[in-house]
Amino acid sequence: MTRKSIAIDMDEVLADTLGEIIDAVNFRADLGIKMEALNGQKLKHVIPEHDGLITEVLREPGFFRHLKVMPHAQEVVKKLTEHYDVYIATAAMDVPTSFSDKYEWLLEFFPFLDPQHFVFCGRKNIVKADYLIDDNPRQLEIFTGTPIMFTAVHNINDDRFERVNSWKDVEQYFLDNIEK
């Protein structure tokens, strides 16, 4: 029997990228932005006067290397690999300086994944998997398999896709019906 495949986004799905951006922007611009303030918006729309600072933070060498892992992501992804072919599909083209950092981060925090399954791309319509778990509605719109939205503060008002709110939800979605 052929195993089904799952492509998983990195930023805001495996890694808490936005939390790190908010911390850096708050520190540098002496702001007090909280995650909850985004309420369905992207950070650049909440503080448009600091859009250049957001870009600067993202382009800093090492930024993507030190992100926190989302709760339960490691354990659930490891379990998924027992039943599915798992790929990491990260849209790295917007921040080309992120390639090495993202690669090293994945090797450190997900050492059980085959690096040949890391896909650095722009648009995820090139990814031919059965499922895509992503926080970005634009990527989910163009994906040809089954799109699954991972909840993030910027997408909470989007109801066009099946949704998972956490890695425990991902585990339930994919593993609860697997024959033991």
From Swiss-Prot:
Gene Ontology terms: biological process: pyrimidine deoxyribonucleotide catabolic process
Cofactor(s) required for function per UniProt: Mg(2+)
EC number: 3.1.3.-
Top-level enzyme category: hydrolase
Keyword annotations from UniProtKB, A to Z: Hydrolase, Magnesium, Metal-binding
Keyword hit for Ligase: no
Entry-linked Gene3D superfamilies: Deoxyribonucleotidase, domain 2, HAD superfamily/HAD-like
InterPro entries, per database record: 5'(3')-deoxyribonucleotidase, HAD-like_sf, HAD_sf
GO molecular-function terms, A-Z: 5'-nucleotidase activity; metal ion binding
Positions that bind Mg(2+): 9, 11, 135
Taxonomy, superkingdom: Bacteria
Cited Pfam families: NT5C
Residues the record marks as active site: 9 (nucleophile), 11 (proton donor)
Family (UniProt): Belongs to the 5'(3')-deoxyribonucleotidase family.
Function text: Dephosphorylates the 5' and 2'(3')-phosphates of deoxyribonucleotides.
PANTHER family cross-referenced by the UniProt entry: 5'(3')-DEOXYRIBONUCLEOTIDASE
Protein known as: Putative 5'(3')-deoxyribonucleotidase
Native source species: Staphylococcus aureus (strain Mu50 / ATCC 700699)
